[in-house]
Amino acid sequence: SPSRGLGDVYKRQEWHRQRGDELVLISASGEHLVAPMAQMLGMDHCVAILLDEEAGMLTGQTRGTLSFREGKVVRINQLFAGKEHLWQGSFGYSDSHNDLPMLQAVSHPHAVNPAPALRQCAEELGWPLWIWQLHP
């Protein structure tokens, strides 16, 4: 089962599903790693770093905007071009201060199991701080 070992993550995903939200897994890792995880989790969309391939081999070159820091906001805007209204009421979850631009762009930012730098920012901005259990 995709939910096995994900505990609170799965519960929150189900909450979003019941609301009819579109679920996006966005990562600064390569799409070849993130896409299978997004599929396993039943995400509607996957946004990750695009890597060039030649003859089925990764070249080490990237293409497009990297989904890192401000690039995550750019890539989400590209994904939902013409549907900018989807930002209204949107939720974002992260553990890293590198995701501050994305968290500042959503309506409901959440710092989840945050690293110290994000914890400090979230406390200063009054964002919810959540500690999720990764095991049921």
What function would you assign to each model-found segment?
Residues R63-N77, W132-P136:
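A polyampholytic, Gly/Pro-enriched intrinsically disordered region
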